Amino acid sequence: MDPEFGRGMAPRKREPWRTTLLLAYQSLGVVYGDLSISPLYVYKSTFAEDITHSESNEEIFGVLSFVFWTLTLIPLIKYVSIVLRADDNGEGGTFALYSLICRHANVSLLPNRQVADEELSTYKLEYPPEVANRSRIKEWLEKHKTLQTALLIMVMIGTCMVIGDGVLTPAISVFSAVSGLELSLSRDQHEYAVIPITCVILVFLFALQHYGTHRVGFLFAPIVLAWLICMSMLGLYNIIHWNPQVYRALNPYYMLKFLRKTKKSGWMSLGGILLCMTGSEAMFADLGHFSYSAIQLAFTTLVYPALILGYMGQAAYLSKHHTLNSTYQIGYYISVPESVRWPVLVLAILASVVGSQAIISGTFSIINQSQSLSCFPRVKVVHTSENIHGQIYIPEINWLLMVLCIAVTVGFRDTKHMGNASGLAVITVMLVTTCLTSLVIMLCWHRSPALALVFFLFFGSIEVLYFSASLIKFREGAWLPIMLALILMAVMFIWHHTTIKKYEFDLHNKVTLEWLLALGDKLGMVRVPGIGLVYTDLTSGVPANFSRFVTNLPAFHRVLVFVCVKSVPVPHVLPAERYLVGRVGPAGHRSYRCIVRYGYRDVHQDVDSFEAELVESLATFIKLDALYHRCSDAGSGSEQLDDGRYERENALTVIGTNPLRRCLSYEASHDGVSSVDAARSPNGIVEVPAAAAAAPVTKKVRFVVEAASPEVEKGVVEELQELCEAREAGTAFILGHSHVQTKPGSSLLKKLAVGVGYNFLRRNCRGPDVVLRVPPASLLEVGMVYVL
């Protein structure tokens, strides 16, 4: 394969082999837990249809052939060889693909995009200059809003199915592992033991989420490794002991014989066979925690061979046993020697818990990403580890998943219905990944549309075959993921659509800068001590909630900052590039604008560190702004404009959380002075010990203003002094409290979606103050009525 295939044509950075080995070992417990336990239920789900296990072995060999080639074509070739290369700055998953497409084609529906976002280190596009920048597909996507909405809906469908998989995978994994008790208990005991034990394990699993997995996470990789070795050894034993000729079933001809003999029943049984791919998407979704080479190494050298040996061993045993009691069905444990059945049962339960933990964590992660892109209602995100980035816990989602998992276990009570439901969720996510990867091949890798079409048709046809086999089982369990997806889709679309309309309403009703500057003592307006942080989604202008605030209370803070916390279509924003700071009006007005940018995988800061970094960024901006004007005035001669700073109101400067880091201005740099040197100028204006690279974050930022310095302008000293005094006086957070209603004459559907649906979600989900981590004692809410 072309070594430059993917990755935006950039060469892949090589890692030390020891690091790769360590990451490959650690990935076993995070990435491959779900995939490694699939042999527990694949054969059992497949033969749950009207397929007889005849003495000719055509059925079992046909199923084994399907399993082998499915594992080879989808996880090995599609994911490991191709999809893993479509990473977004090392991150994978559905939103990573969508983010790549949004950056290479103007199809993002995020409302407050800026040209400055394209200068982010993680945003920049890399492709050969000889590649044409325009393509017909790109032009179609950018021209038609309907196609952009369809693309977002497809991403939402994939997200909903991942969340649905978070409900179904723990249930089927733990239930299949515990069902091994059926070989050691009587029928009555089995019926009354397996379900309660499964429910107890699920409750225990979800109850532990609050404490995080970092304390026991070191056990995950050894458990999965032990399970893979155990499965391989049992597979080799069964092959050698029962049928060494089972390898002949790897011939794809057995797939054709299987379908010829079983006809419609064989096609429907594909819904059980596809479960062998369960967990393949995790290789891509968890790419950011490891590396491409580590995941590739672990799968090709250990996971893939172990799975093949496990499935071949089961087939070898079943090929010599055709008169199995229907009570036992054709499960995994029937092929395990009785002398080691109990240890294998315990190890399988542990492995199923590890696999379930991985999918639960993945569900939390994708909901957090959806929330960042305004596609999911606000929820409380708790970070369970200070050292491990991205390890999060969402309380309301956790308990909802637990209730649904237990309901699925108690309601279905068998592997067949759980497998049908889980299979449809899994294959739908894979179809979405195939469609998005095809677009990435054309738009991001700038490959031929023919190559993208070949990729789409080849893998898409395989997945559509499995999808049809799963969908036909709608009444036998497949209805559940569809129902969950429809509910989640309605929630996500209503929230996203209304959020966009609210932004458009704010944009249309914002007030002018002249109105803000006209607020003065003559109108009875009072400037009170302190810093006022006015939160808004707007990146320019004065929001309507502030005008409503001063209309009802004719006073605002001496230092006023309009804060816009926004998400950009990149996984991470470097701390040195997070803040965009500029003035609103002349310097004497003491009003600023600060745009805080986060990636869809970034962690929002707690209020103490955020407040400290924000004030620090303002101080650094004041220095750089003064230096800019000093150099500009020197370059333009003796002529000096009194309103020069007013002219730069629309100019925003990148201010990092560490002044020693690189700072950039989005205006042309014609002053010839390094911004790093400016941030470190020896005039003694600002001293910010809290931002030192190696120092811990403190809750206060102090400024030392040396008025005696001859290089310091008097106005800069006064401005910094006022900022220092305002910081000591305290900070108030001013947020809008929205009330949404529809316009008179709106359609019934709009009234239900916006007036009922959105308002219900808004009242019952977390408020913006919780998401922004605003302290209640410093919160001021301004009522805003949105007529949409």
From Swiss-Prot:
It comes from the Eukaryota. The keyword Nucleotidyltransferase does not apply. Residues 1-21, 81-151, 213-215, 286-292, 365-391, 444-451, 498-788 are cytoplasmic. GO terms for biological process: potassium ion transport. Glycans are attached at residues 325, 420. Its main location: membrane. GO terms for molecular function: potassium ion transmembrane transporter activity. Residues 43-59, 173-191, 237-264, 314-343, 413-422, 473-476 are extracellular. It is a multi-pass membrane protein. GO terms for cellular component: membrane. The chain crosses the membrane at residues 22-42, 60-80, 152-172, 192-212, 216-236, 265-285, 293-313, 344-364, 392-412, 423-443, 452-472, 477-497. It is found in: Membrane. Keywords: Glycoprotein, Ion transport, Membrane, Potassium, Potassium transport, Transmembrane, Transmembrane helix, Transport. Belongs to the HAK/KUP transporter (TC 2.A.72.3) family. High-affinity potassium transporter. PANTHER family: OSMOTIC STRESS POTASSIUM TRANSPORTER, POTASSIUM TRANSPORTER 9-RELATED. This is Probable potassium transporter 9. It comes from Oryza sativa subsp. japonica.
